[in-house]
């Protein structure tokens, strides 16, 4: 990874660790949970080789970026504020945006600041229009029960104890290799997930060690705080109820992705609802045999799918 440079940028009251490579039009990558800039290692090298400036920060609460202690510091407004400040510090006016659970924040970025986005490639997590009648957590509890993982992440200390009950490397092996497409309803926590006997070809012990070393140092609370701020973000986004995402968009999802199998999601994506809420949605790609972490699992295909879209602009 000798071509990847690392820096620390002051933005929005925090210090943000940023990995970047190349020069040219900027592509900003937003990682998911429980991940880091490192999840985009393949894309950074590929797009930088094609004449792009590829930028992948550790988001607030992750890796070598500051982690404010309060869950209320992890709303979409905070995260998008961090990213706008980052672009300002880097002297970048507009970016191509790419996200996974970063996808959640990428949708909000496009909702709040479409002027800063040339085009969007989002992976795994579809746009969810704000429902003014029910908060996200109440909706999840109603639909999937209290043992749904987002609900289990809410009480401070409980999820931390679950993730701390096995060594960090083992937890990453469990998490990154999940292939059960059913929504994670986990009465006994993520520690109850199966540990693979061997790693898949796309994931090395070195990769696991990188994630594990960072999270062993920081813990997982920063990541959990995104989930703990979901309802606060919902409250604060009331002015955007009914707003559309008006950015050219490509959406990519694996057919084994757990989010793709949430109740009603396939119907929303393929039945016209998604296109109504994202009117400049140009393409939906469903990748056969791929699960949630497709930017790592199917790196070459994802690289090509991203490039084929952004090169048009």
UniProtKB/Swiss-Prot annotation:
Pathway: Secondary metabolite biosynthesis; terpenoid biosynthesis. GO terms for molecular function: hydrolase activity. Pfam families: Abhydrolase_1. Keywords: Hydrolase. Its EC number is 3.3.2.10, 3.3.2.-. An epoxide binds at residue 149. It comes from the Eukaryota. It catalyses: an epoxide + H2O = an ethanediol; (24S)-24,25-epoxycucurbitadienol + H2O = (24R)-24,25-dihydroxycucurbitadienol. Highly expressed in fruits 15 days after anthesis (15-DAA). The keyword Hydrolase applies. Residues 25-299 form the AB hydrolase-1 domain. The keyword Transmembrane helix does not apply. The record marks 149, 227 as: Contributes to the formation of an oxyanion binding site for the epoxide oxygen of substrate. The active site is at 100 (nucleophile), 227 (proton donor), 292 (proton acceptor). Epoxide hydrolase involved in the biosynthesis of cucurbitacin and mogroside tetracyclic triterpene natural products (e.g. siamenoside I and mogrosides IV, V and VI). Cucurbitacins have cytotoxic properties and exhibit deterrent taste as a defense barrier against herbivores. Mogrosides are nonsugar highly oxygenated compounds used as high-intensity zero-calorie sweeteners; they also possess pharmacological properties such as regulating immunity, lowering blood sugar and lipid levels, protecting the liver, and acting as antioxidants and antitumor agents. Mogrosides, the major active constituents of S.grosvenorii fruits, are a mixture of cucurbitane-type triterpenoid glycosides that have been proven to be powerful and zero-caloric sweeteners and can hence be used as a sucrose substitute for diabetic and obese patients. Belongs to the AB hydrolase superfamily. Epoxide hydrolase family. PANTHER family: EPOXIDE HYDROLASE (PTHR43329). Homodimer. This is Epoxide hydrolase 1. It comes from Siraitia grosvenorii.
